Amino acid sequence: MVGQLSEGAIAAIMQKGDTNIKPILQVINIRPITTGNSPPRYRLLMSDGLNTLSSFMLATQLNPLVEEEQLSSNCVCQIHRFIVNTLKDGRRVVILMELEVLKSAEAVGVKIGNPVPYNEGLGQPQVAPPAPAASPAASSRPQPQNGSSGMGSTVSKAYGASKTFGKAAGPSLSHTSGGTQSKVVPIASLTPYQSKWTICARVTNKSQIRTWSNSRGEGKLFSLELVDESGEIRATAFNEQVDKFFPLIEVNKVYYFSKGTLKIANKQFTAVKNDYEMTFNNETSVMPCEDDHHLPTVQFDFTGIDDLENKSKDSLVDIIGICKSYEDATKITVRSNNREVAKRNIYLMDTSGKVVTATLWGEDADKFDGSRQPVLAIKGARVSDFGGRSLSVLSSSTIIANPDIPEAYKLRGWFDAEGQALDGVSISDLKSGGVGGSNTNWKTLYEVKSENLGQGDKPDYFSSVATVVYLRKENCMYQACPTQDCNKKVIDQQNGLYRCEKCDTEFPNFKYRMILSVNIADFQENQWVTCFQESAEAILGQNAAYLGELKDKNEQAFEEVFQNANFRSFIFRVRVKVETYNDESRIKATVMDVKPVDYREYGRRLVMSIRRSALM
């Protein structure tokens, strides 16, 4: 049975660092290594039939092989791709990047042969491997011959004589800006205890420059996410390094990075799977790398939408889903700094049929185009528990539309075949329902009352197609503070000035604001709702400033605006919550959004509902 293994492969790897071979080895033992909050790492003791070596490390993307028990003690596997890292003390670690289990542990049953431990420190002579075939590296896996299992006579073709390291292989030499040479090491091998190192990595994400100012001073920073074949790491530059490196570094380009400061990663602010993170310092060097074809792009560790309900609040996740629908971008004012930013909600669905609301901010919100229902892969979205489970896409998150990965093709195929006909079930509303258009949790007004929505500790949200049957125009408008961020009612001083108690200021003018009570109805029930500025303007088809002018100058025209709004139908997004006033509890319904009815989408949804009812 020894002939099944690539005898001498361990010596070839450890003495010459040969990464062009594809040896067949047996797993003797697997030991997990504690890595804090990061994915577990596994250390393997492997045999080539002559020697054993415990310096094999499994790349994290191969962890499922261990967790699903495909890779276990006594199994035989072929290593298709690996890298060799040399530690400070001269010892070598072999990181397994790609392998194939040729024979399960159950099929093999025992340790093959009588291998002895390889002693790297004694300079053990290399066992000469069999002569290589003409093109040993061209085959991606051993081909069975004469009904064999892919081992035996093909083993000698799995690897050849040792060669010098290739650019995609283990430690190589890179010239830094200082003219010296340093070894290129994998990201997975970086620790704070190393002083001289160089990595070759692809930039998969680059943040905008952010500034801060506090009692200790002010400054600026930007961050990067870097990836190579072994793993990923986050890097941050501050102040002078921002000026130096921000204009030079481009997303998706590959660079040599040297001499950064390594420290324990703050997992609160990054979804990057690494225990450490890098900070640029005065000695940091960044040099372009032209040979970039071998490096991967963004690494994802996807969480299914139906699994988000098990994730804790504020945790960071990678998610992939079809953009089922999306809302228009709106502007909101951030209270902490009075800065106006764009906000847009999008609705993502995966093969589970579950839908989650993800919120885009700033430039991501402004530039988003979901018209073709793209597949979106998002790395590092923050989980929120607002109304169930929802996601917030941070400035540090990475968004890729229609990524070239198997998960995206699988999702697109499913959606085109059957998913697009589903409403989906939202996990972003406490009482979730279907999804269609840009709203979730469809309810008739009768269902809202019969299901006691709004009676719990938290408010409930629903969407309904309803018709305006009455508008209470009395006291629907008030004179408000003219400043942008204040809507407080002003007091007419009767001297041409209007006083805002909140701002403690008098103004020569004011702005009109609306609070409109509307009775809406569908085929079963009716409901009084309160509409504030934007939703009231959408129903009436006029802005508050124009309506205020009509009210003062042309009462008849003002009346006609309200009459014309009667018996118009809309999609209402409503918040309901029980409120108590003077010991009397009642349901308060507030309109959060008003949109025109897309009758094609509405009809499709009704047809699907009828079909589901027919199957019950």
Curated annotation (Swiss-Prot):
Phosphoserine: modified positions: S384
PTM-bearing positions, type N6-acetyllysine: K163, K167, K259
Entry-annotated residues carrying Phosphothreonine: T180, T191
Zinc finger (C4-type) residue numbers: 481-503
Superkingdom of this protein's organism: Eukaryota
Effect of V227A: In PFBMFT6; uncertain significance; increased single-stranded DNA binding; increased telomeric DNA binding; has no effect on the formation of canonical replication protein A complex
Cross-link (Glycyl lysine isopeptide (Lys-Gly) (interchain with G-Cter in SUMO)): K449, K577
Post-translational modification, as annotated: DNA damage-induced 'Lys-63'-linked polyubiquitination by PRPF19 mediates ATRIP recruitment to the RPA complex at sites of DNA damage and activation of ATR. Ubiquitinated by RFWD3 at stalled replication forks in response to DNA damage: ubiquitination by RFWD3 does not lead to degradation by the proteasome and promotes removal of the RPA complex from stalled replication forks, promoting homologous recombination. Sumoylated on lysine residues Lys-449 and Lys-577, with Lys-449 being the major site. Sumoylation promotes recruitment of RAD51 to the DNA damage foci to initiate DNA repair through homologous recombination. Desumoylated by SENP6.
Effect of R41E: Loss of HELB-binding
Subunit structure of this chain's protein: Component of the canonical replication protein A complex (RPA), a heterotrimer composed of RPA1, RPA2 and RPA3. Also a component of the aRPA, the alternative replication protein A complex, a trimeric complex similar to the replication protein A complex/RPA but where RPA1 and RPA3 are associated with RPA4 instead of RPA2. The DNA-binding activity may reside exclusively on the RPA1 subunit. Interacts with PRPF19; the PRP19-CDC5L complex is recruited to the sites of DNA repair where it ubiquitinates the replication protein A complex (RPA). Interacts with RIPK1.
Name the UniProt record assigns to this protein: Replication protein A 70 kDa DNA-binding subunit
Gene name of the encoded protein: RPA1
